[in-house]
């Protein structure tokens, strides 16, 4: 490629609406342009990166015998009604009517479509196992699109689906995908963790997320420094909560006899220690709206995902605000406590182990102090409802935990018979019996990978792409070609040789000042730069500059091709 024939579309200034570094650099480097909220045009530089990621994914899919297909973007709404997921996705679905007044959806995912296809296509166990995949644009009506392509209304995904006659076969394929994803992300050179996760709206029993580490990520993961333990913080359990499950049957409630002394709020000279917060949330019991109380240590954070797992809690989770608490309970939320509440009370496991603690008294400006379970208060319903912390011991016994922000770039699920039962997908067994098939599904967020790699690889000058997905691997930067025939000859000759060697190279043949040329190339992030200048050409040498460390080396012209091939691991 010659720069004179290429659309760079770089910007000098950072657009004011771009808040995170990946969004800023994708706009500045000319990878994308915003069309509307959460909707972007992909420009040539962005497309080149996307295509290289797709190629890596396709190569790995071929290794596990996955067959490429292409499913429609438009899906009949009836399929989603059959699976029961229409209400779960709710307003996130783009829905529309055709001219015949039939209802359709722009697909955010393809479980319904692919299950319907298999139901009509596969009849016998002899046709299984089967793995199919596609790379396609998906749609989701995000309420608040943000962070550029990290949370957008349309995005590109690789989604794969596997079909099996039994659970053992599904587990084998699941493990193949798990390793395949590790291979993909290692080739892309992205820092990630594979973590235990919840299946959420996808259903199924077992799932793993692949999370790219990023300070601007929306997710949080917890992992051990010393062991293989890693989990999404939503599902992470401490050793304390696991041990409680083993001993909870031995809890014997006592008759409550004593009454606790109170202490005025203004008597506390320091922040209150050993304090239990009481938080009200909405519930639905027998379809009747009501309230429940959640008890948690002052220093802990509620885990919204775990709370929604409680049957009676209203979904989505809804907290009672300050004004409502004062109206309903006659007290400010700060002084709300569990004593005397006539509603269900759920306490975190860590709260159960507390002694001589402080709670709100349900009287403004007063607390109960030195409170104990089974003495002053009946033991409530104990649940794991908080986020794990660095001070916790993980479920595998690790005492050295890290909690990091991350971006989800992949997710794999063992769906089991979740969809085949709902949509009645049966195949004939060896003995002429019919049974529901087992399914797995496996997603990679291709556009999210682009943002995640940039979040991990940049400096003050721009993006620093890994070789494997850089828009170009090598750029040739000739200086003063108009006045030096030798520079022009060497430049053209090197360009032809590199193209012949199948090296992805761009020749910067635009008539620009060196400063503009170098700034543009650094911003785009081409990893290997060859500078051909009058300063060194008389010695038959060119300057090699590596983008990731900005180090320069003089290389003989006749050795530069071998040098680059070695750098690119081509020999």
UniProtKB/Swiss-Prot annotation:
Its EC number is 6.1.1.15. It catalyses: tRNA(Pro) + L-proline + ATP = L-prolyl-tRNA(Pro) + AMP + diphosphate. One of its GO terms (cellular component) is cytosol. CDD domains: ProRS-INS, ProRS_anticodon_short, ProRS_core_prok. It is found in: Cytoplasm. It comes from the Bacteria. GO terms for biological process: prolyl-tRNA aminoacylation. It holds the Pfam family HGTP_anticodon. Keywords: Aminoacyl-tRNA synthetase, ATP-binding, Cytoplasm, Ligase, Nucleotide-binding, Protein biosynthesis. One of its GO terms (molecular function) is ATP binding. InterPro entries: aa-tRNA-synt_IIb (IPR002314), aa-tRNA-synth_II (IPR006195), aa-tRNA-synth_II/BPL/LPL (IPR045864), Anticodon-bd (IPR004154), Anticodon-bd_dom_sf (IPR036621), Pro-tRNA-ligase_IIa (IPR002316), Pro-tRNA-synth_IIa_bac-type (IPR004500), Pro-tRNA-Synthase_IIa_type1 (IPR023717). Consists of three domains: the N-terminal catalytic domain, the editing domain and the C-terminal anticodon-binding domain. Homodimer. Belongs to the class-II aminoacyl-tRNA synthetase family. ProS type 1 subfamily. NCBIfam families: PRK09194.1, proS_fam_II. Catalyzes the attachment of proline to tRNA(Pro) in a two-step reaction: proline is first activated by ATP to form Pro-AMP and then transferred to the acceptor end of tRNA(Pro). As ProRS can inadvertently accommodate and process non-cognate amino acids such as alanine and cysteine, to avoid such errors it has two additional distinct editing activities against alanine. One activity is designated as 'pretransfer' editing and involves the tRNA(Pro)-independent hydrolysis of activated Ala-AMP. This is Proline--tRNA ligase. The gene is proS.
């Amino acid at each position: 490629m010659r720069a004179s024939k290429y659309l760079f579309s770089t910007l000098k200034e950072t657009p004011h609406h771009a808040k995170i570094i990946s969004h800023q650099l994708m706009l500045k480097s000319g990878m994308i342009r915003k069309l509307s909220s959460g909707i972007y045009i992909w420009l040539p530089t962005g497309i080149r990166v996307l295509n290289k990621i797709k190629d890596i994914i396709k190569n790995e899919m071929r290794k596990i015998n996955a067959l490429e297909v292409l499913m429609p973007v438009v899906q009949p709404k009836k399929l989603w009604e059959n699976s029961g997921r229409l209400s779960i996705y709710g307003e996130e679905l783009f829905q529309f009517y055709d001219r015949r007044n039939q209802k359709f959806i722009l697909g955010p995912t393809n479980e319904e479509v692919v299950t319907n296809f298999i139901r009509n296509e596969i009849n016998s166990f002899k046709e299984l196992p089967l793995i199919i995949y596609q790379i396609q644009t998906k749609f989701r009506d995000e309420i608040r699109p943000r962070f550029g392509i990290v949370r957008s209304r349309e995005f590109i995904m690789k989604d794969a689906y596997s079909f099996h006659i039994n659970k053992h076969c599904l587990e084998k394929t699941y493990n193949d995908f798990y390793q395949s994803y590790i291979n993909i992300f290692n080739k892309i050179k992205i820092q990630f963790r594979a973590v235990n996760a919840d299946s959420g709206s996808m259903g199924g029993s077992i799932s793993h997320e692949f999370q790219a580490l990023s300070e601007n990520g929306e997710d949080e993961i917890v992992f051990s420094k010393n062991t293989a333990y890693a989990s999404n913080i939503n599902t992470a359990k401490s050793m304390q909560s696991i041990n409680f499950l083993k001993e909870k049957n031995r809890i014997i409630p006592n008759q409550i006899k004593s009454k606790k002394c109170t202490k005025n709020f203004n008597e506390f000279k320091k922040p209150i220690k050993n304090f239990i917060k009481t938080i009200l949330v909405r519930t639905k019991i027998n379809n009747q709206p009501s309230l429940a109380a959640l008890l948690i240590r002052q220093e802990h954070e509620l885990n919204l995902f775990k709370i929604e797992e409680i049957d009676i809690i209203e979904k989505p989770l809804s907290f009672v605000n300050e004004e409502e608490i004062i109206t309903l309970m006659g007290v400010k939320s700060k002084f709300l406590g569990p004593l005397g509440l006539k509603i269900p009370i759920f306490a975190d496991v860590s709260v159960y182990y507390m002694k001589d603690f402080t709670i709100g008294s349900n009287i403004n400006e007063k607390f109960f102090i030195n409170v104990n379970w089974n003495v002053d208060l009946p033991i409530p319903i104990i649940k794991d409802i908080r986020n794990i912390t660095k001070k916790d011991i993980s479920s595998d016994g690790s005492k050295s935990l890290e909690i990091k922000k991350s971006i989800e770039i992949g997710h794999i699920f063992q769906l089991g018979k979740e969809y085949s039962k709902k949509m009645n997908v049966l195949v004939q067994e060896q003995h002429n019996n019919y049974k529901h098939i087992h399914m797995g599904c496996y997603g990679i967020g291709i556009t999210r990978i682009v943002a995640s790699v940039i979040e991990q690889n940049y400096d003050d000058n721009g993006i620093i792409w890994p070789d494997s997905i850089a828009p170009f691997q090598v750029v040739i930067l000739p200086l003063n070609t108009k006045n030096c025939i030798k520079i022009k000859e060497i430049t053209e000759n090197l360009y032809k040789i590199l193209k012949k060697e199948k090296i992805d190279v761009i020749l910067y043949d635009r008539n620009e000042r060196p400063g503009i040329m170098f700034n543009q190339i650094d911003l785009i992030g081409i990893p290997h730069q060859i500078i051909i200048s009058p300063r060194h050409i008389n010695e038959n040498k060119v300057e090699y500059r590596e983008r990731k460390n900005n180090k320069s080396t003089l290389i003989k012209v006749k050795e530069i091709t071998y040098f680059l091939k070695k750098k690119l691991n081509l020999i």
